[in-house]
Amino acid sequence: MNFLLSKLLLGLIRFYQYCISPLIPPRCRYTPTCSQYAVEAVKKYGAFKGGRLAIKRIARCHPFGGHGHDPVP
């Protein structure tokens, strides 16, 4: 189950990276970008924990949040 959800999440993230992201200006305050962070988190921890880490990261990515290098733990 987790494997299938991971593949689904990775597919959705890749769709965003290749089809939607090129149409909007770069806004991510972190490196790696939030979408790349999500890919790495899901690959490393699976759909549930990786997805939770990705959501927390995206929630921090705003003008009053942090910035700089923030790798997947």
From Swiss-Prot:
Entry-linked Pfam families: YidD (PF01809)
Keyword Plastid: no
Keyword Ribosomal protein recorded: no
Keywords: Cell inner membrane, Cell membrane, Membrane
Family: Belongs to the UPF0161 family.
UniProt organism field: Neisseria meningitidis serogroup B (strain ATCC BAA-335 / MC58)
Cellular compartments per GO CC: plasma membrane
Disulfide bonding pattern of the chain: none
Membrane topology: Peripheral membrane protein
NCBIfam families, per the entry: membrane protein insertion efficiency factor YidD
Its job: Could be involved in insertion of integral membrane proteins into the membrane.
Protein known as: Putative membrane protein insertion efficiency factor
